[in-house]
A protein has these predicted regions:
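Extended, charge-rich alpha-helical interface modules
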Residues: 1-80
């Protein structure tokens, strides 16, 4: 996955997250949508991690295409 594809995914997920937050603020969030919001947050963490891996590999003179998404349970515990 290219940097551009990852950024596109991040943007898409962020837009979906914002829409769900607007619904939540209006008191219109169904339980399934609340669950989706949780999944989006985890997927965003994973996508940002992959983008950071690619940048680190590139900066080290290595092939960024060797970066792979890490398991969600690994990236969700990272400190911001």
């Amino acid at each position: 996955m290219t940097d551009e594809a990852i950024r596109t995914r991040i943007n898409h997920l962020s837009q979906e997250e914002e829409a769900l937050y607007r619904e939540a603020a209006a008191g219109q969030l169904a339980p399934a949508e609340l669950e989706r919001l949780t999944v989006i947050k985890l997927e965003l963490d994973q996508a940002w991690d992959l983008l950071h891996q690619r940048e680190a590999l590139r900066n080290a003179g290595m092939d960024p295409d060797t970066a792979r998404p890490r398991p969600i349970d690994m990236v969700e515990g990272y400190q911001q």
